[in-house]
Amino acid sequence: MSTSGMLFIFATFCPCFLSCCAFMSHWKLKDFSFRFLRMCGERSLVVCYPLKLLKQIRSLFSIAIGHLSLMLIEGSANLLSLEEISRTLLRILDFVGNKNMRTYLEVPLCRWHISQARPN
């Protein structure tokens, strides 16, 4: 699948996910997102089939961005956990090797945390 096609799917999916996150309890999202991030951080789970890979990356981005959003809105941000999320996202992006997808994450909500995780 082309980069533009993947970015289109991300751009379509993430706003819907963030809307749904607003109705989820914070502890449930936090628990699920960290378990999912730890699981997806393992290279062995990132498979070579494009569709499955796309679904894993899309889910990872959506959960992490949704979690960052809720933590920042609630004012309960823990810098260590935010840094962990940012580093995990960047590791997945680096492994996939698509630098264009990295710009999709640079929304105002998490730009600072990503820049803290990896200096320019």
UniProtKB/Swiss-Prot annotation:
Keywords: Membrane, Signal, Transmembrane, Transmembrane helix
Signal sequence range: 1-22
Membrane-spanning ranges: 60-80
Primary subcellular site in the record, as a coarse category: membrane
Statement: the UniProt record of this protein carries the keyword Membrane: yes
GO CC, any one term: membrane
Record topology, Extracellular segments: 23-59
Keyword Membrane: yes
UniProt topology in membrane: Single-pass membrane protein
Subcellular location: Membrane
Domain of life of the source: Eukaryota
Segments in the Cytoplasmic topological domain: 81-120
The protein's name: Uncharacterized protein C1F8.08
